[in-house]
């Protein structure tokens, strides 16, 4: 248990300053997860890339049982602020996107994708995904840490990883026709 707490402390010491230095605000800790908001989507993406790369480098020098691999899910939308917390459908979508991100990676919503200068990043569509307790399928993208990582994984390999992890890719047109 003390080993797990040591890893959690290292996790927080890596993520928290990066969030703050990228115009982010930590809303709360939820177990080993951190819920944060940022001034802009680009700030959120850049912070996420930095701490994912820090964990990647750290893991390359650590024993496997000491690896820290986190999932990042980013979404942009309207929220309700109450008692220094955030609520609303946008919060739920962000949380659900995080849950489908492969360990050690970043998944972003279409709203984040549209607000970025996508030429600055390596991004591949993960397709439309039905997220738990979210009415309509969401277009989700995998944001790669660098060009090499992007080139190392084909679109087919990304789709295959969804199948292996039980993530359903949905044709939104067919889905809407079946819902009517």
Q: At which residue positions do the language-model features occur?
A:
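Catalytic NTP-binding/metal-coordinating core of nucleotidyl cyclase/transferase enzymes
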Residues: 1-47, 53-54
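Catalytic beta-strand-to-alpha-helix segment of the class III nucleotidyl cyclase homology domain
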Residues: 35-145
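Intrinsically disordered or compositionally simple regulatory linkers and C-terminal tails
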Residues: 143-180
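Juxtamembrane/interface motifs at transmembrane-helix termini
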Residues: 25-26, 65-67, 158-159
